[in-house]
């Protein structure tokens, strides 16, 4: 840019918009406004089916996009009101009946992400928030993460009642 940038904004898709006193940006004519789009955008897609729990429809969603140098945040809802929750992160997709690995589990529940890294959380009123700090390392760009929550529901005496799973997320790490 051939002059001052006075304002910056990030669009919902991650593009950067700059406004200022410049008339060129990146060697191109650009009167006072420029848009920078990354060749490697961060994306998140929902895949697979969840199975219902005592808390309702288990749902796993992204609350932010996985950009290098940021904290990628996700949230599970509709989980049992009290459960130990495995936060499953993997580098490949799977499709294993949950009952084959963690009985008792209802028919239709499946493990949809390879358990390469597993963290444990406790549901709070049927909700679990998870986060993953992504270093500002461009070599992470394009790496695909498969993620899912598996809830191990317990009763008041901490006896296991049933195990259920959410849909999966497929997150591609992006960078500028």
Regions found by a protein language model. Give the residues of each.
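Residue-level hotspots within well-ordered secondary structure
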Residues: 39-176
């Amino acid at each position: 840019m051939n002059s001052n940038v006075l304002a910056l904004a990030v669009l919902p898709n991650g593009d950067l918009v700059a406004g200022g006193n410049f008339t060129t940006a990146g060697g191109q004519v650009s009167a006072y406004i420029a848009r920078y789009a990354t060749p490697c955008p961060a994306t998140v897609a929902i895949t697979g089916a969840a199975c219902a729990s005592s808390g309702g429809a288990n749902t796993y969603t992204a609350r932010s996009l996985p950009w290098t140098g940021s904290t990628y945040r996700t949230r599970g809802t509709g989980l049992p009101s009290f459960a130990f929750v495995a936060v499953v992160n993997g580098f490949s997709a799977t499709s294993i009946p949950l009952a084959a690995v963690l009985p008792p589990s209802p028919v239709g529940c499946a493990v949809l992400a390879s358990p390469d890294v597993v963290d444990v959380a406790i549901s709070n009123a049927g909700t679990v928030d998870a986060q993953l700090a992504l270093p500002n390392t461009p070599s992470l760009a394009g790496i695909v993460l498969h993620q899912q929550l598996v809830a191990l529901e317990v009763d008041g005496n901490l006896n296991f009642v049933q195990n259920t799973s959410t849909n999966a997320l497929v997150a591609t790490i992006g960078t500028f």
